[in-house]
């Protein structure tokens, strides 16, 4: 990856990155600006709502990029939590034209954005997400925009370098993206079905094909055999990812209002498995959610 020339990739993603503005996104932008003030550098809009542009009965996904956690938060505890295990995730609702729209936003510093999408980041949590298309709902200046683009360049290069050794020859764009995304999903506790990676690729095939083409022109390694070292790293990454996922879930209980209900909603939405939540789960999630997660894992609702 160090020998890659990613200038063409940067130029391509620069042209592709758009700033999306509508009444709903502007409402969420105002909320985040009010909360984080001058520390807010950009708001990255991503996920299924970006692809569909349908906001009702859905959960919008944002990353709030801040200059540093100490400046962004009034609470030293929240800043410490974000520094120790990024990101902190929060729930927000706005009302637009009489309709309530809900979102979750994750808070990440500029430093972590660039570090955690680089090849130095072992786990795929960040570079798997930022390798996919996103838009900006807000950026403070052109430097903030360029940093978002650089994070995507980093992520694309990193996901390639971390997964290409799983192939015994150069894959097609579809084979690469579907295989790589499936591998990153397996490294977390995810509610997505096994068809999710393929549907994400199909939803924006021209984008993924073009990015893959730019990668090949950047001088990437072309595999001739499956790398046992890469395979082993993904075994370790998957195990470590499950631990990180559990830690992030536990942390989210203190930052995410109605976090247990959101988790149940997301699992049911992606897997079709109904999740029954009662007051005990909400009041004592650390105690009563483990048996529920175990049952969901056995049903295949959580991977």
Model regions and ranges:
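Catalytic core of pol beta-like nucleotidyltransferases
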Residues: 1-35, 44, 50-56, 68-303
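Short hydrophobic/aromatic beta-strand micro-patches
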Residues: 63-65
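Short glycine-/polar-rich loops that comprise or flank the Walker A/P-loop
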Residues: 58-60
């Amino acid at each position: 990856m160090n020998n890659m020339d990613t200038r063409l990739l940067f130029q391509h993603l620069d042209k592709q990155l758009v700033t999306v503005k509508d009444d709903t996104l502007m409402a969420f932008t105002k909320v985040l600006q009010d909360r984080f003030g001058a520390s807010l550098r950009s708001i990255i809009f991503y996920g299924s709502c970006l692809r569909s542009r349908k906001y009702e009965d859905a959960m919008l996904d944002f990353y709030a990029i801040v200059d540093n956690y100490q400046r962004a938060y009034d609470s030293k505890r929240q800043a410490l939590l974000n520094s120790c295990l990024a990101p902190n995730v929060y729930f927000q609702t706005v009302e637009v034209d009489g309709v309530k729209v809900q979102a979750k936003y994750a808070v990440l510093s500029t430093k972590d954005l660039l570090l955690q999408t680089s090849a130095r980041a072992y786990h795929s949590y960040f570079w798997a997400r930022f390798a996919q298309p996103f838009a900006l709902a807000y950026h403070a200046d052109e430097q903030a925009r360029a940093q978002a683009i650089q994070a995507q360049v980093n992520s694309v290069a990193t996901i390639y370098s971390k997964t290409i050794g799983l192939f015994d020859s150069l894959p097609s764009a579809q084979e690469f993206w579907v295989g790589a995304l499936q591998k990153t999903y397996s490294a977390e506790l995810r509610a997505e079905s096994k068809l999710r990676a393929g549907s994400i690729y199909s939803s924006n095939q021209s984008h993924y094909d073009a990015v893959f083409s730019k990668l090949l022109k950047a001088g990437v390694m072309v595999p001739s055999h499956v790398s046992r070292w890469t395979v082993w790293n993904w075994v370790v990454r998957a195990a470590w990812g499950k631990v990180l996922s559990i830690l992030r879930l536990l942390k989210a209980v203190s930052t995410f209002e109605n976090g247990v209900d959101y988790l149940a909603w997301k699992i049911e939405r992606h897997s079709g498995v109904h999740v029954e939540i009662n007051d005990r789960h909400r009041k004592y999630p650390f105690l009563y959610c483990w048996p529920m997660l175990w049952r969901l894992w056995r049903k295949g609702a959580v991977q």
